C-alpha cells in the first residue's frame, strides 16, 4: 500500500498501512491516524513525541491498528 520500506514485512498483512499521513487520513476520514511501530507491537497517537518520527514506522487507522493487535504506547494514546 505504498510502503516501500524494509520493515513492511513485520506489519500485520490485514492492516492497511501508509507511507504518508495524508494517505491514511484520506483512507479513514472518521478515525484517528496513528503511527505504528510493528517491531514493538505499538502505536503512537499524533499528540505523542514519536508520532511519525521513528525510522521503522508507518501510518495506519487507529481501529485497524487495534484490530491487528497493536497496542497504545502509553495510556494517553489509547482511544485518541
Residue locations for each model-derived region?
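Bacterial N-terminal signal peptides
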Residues: 1-2
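Mature, structured domains enriched in cysteine- and short glycine motifs
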Residues: 5-80
Amino acid at each position: 500500500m505504498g510502503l516501500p520500506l524494509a520493515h513492511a514485512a513485520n506489519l500485520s498483512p490485514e492492516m492497511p498501512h501508509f507511507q504518508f499521513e495524508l494517505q491514511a487520513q484520506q483512507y479513514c476520514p472518521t478515525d484517528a491516524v496513528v503511527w505504528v511501530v510493528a517491531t514493538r507491537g505499538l502505536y503512537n497517537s499524533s499528540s505523542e513525541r514519536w508520532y511519525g518520527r521513528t525510522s521503522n514506522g508507518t501510518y495506519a487507522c487507529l481501529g485497524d491498528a487495534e484490530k491487528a493487535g497493536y497496542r497504545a504506547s502509553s495510556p494517553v494514546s489509547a482511544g485518541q
